Amino acid sequence: MQWTLVVPLKALARAKSRLADTAGDGLRPGLALAFAQDTVAAALASAAVRDVAVVTGDPVAGRELAALGARIVADEPAGGLNAALAHAAAVVRSGRPDSGVAALNADLPALRPAELARVLEAAVEFPRAFLPDAAAIGTTLLAAAPGRELLPAFGTDSRARHRASGAVELGLGGVNSVRQDVDTGADLRAALALGVGPRTAAAAARLLIPGPQGDR
């Protein structure tokens, strides 16, 4: 089965504030865009992915990600991340009612297509399933099988919240690139150690952070 991914991205000017100790105000928007571009490019290259819908109200991000082949869905209603994801899932399903839908974080710059395919193939076995992040507190992917609502519960302690909602936690090994989201400088260094995509490698080079880059 191939999946449609829904990728949320907030306005670039407000993105990645927790990277303030690593990247200044003038660099963070470009870094957030680079993360999203590398995430979307890798997702579109995965054999398990049919297409990618990016949920954003940022015109620059929308233009750049559409150029990669993503569909852009307006960031609405104005009710936060989970409302936007639920809306986007409904938009996707309006045209493909039998599609499996998965929400994927936009800050996975080390994402590898084959590892994403493994996660999505495992998710096929369950009505709803999720993958915890590298910190084992949050969530990087939430999948809903055809005919099932996504019911996103992203935010603080989303791992516990998704588990409480009835979604099955995927305990896969060897999928570090799908779990390594980037919120802090330490996260970015961990992603660089895995090997990030070309756009993140170029943006991170301006930060003078040591570590392997662009090898994936």
Swiss-Prot record:
Phosphoenolpyruvate binds at residues 139, 155, 158. It catalyses: phosphoenolpyruvate + GTP + H(+) = enolpyruvoyl-2-diphospho-5'-guanosine + diphosphate. InterPro entries: CofC, MobA-like_NTP_Trfase, Nucleotide-diphossugar_trans. One of its GO terms (molecular function) is phospholactate guanylyltransferase activity. One of its GO terms (biological process) is F420-0 metabolic process. Belongs to the CofC family. This is Phosphoenolpyruvate guanylyltransferase. The gene is fbiD.
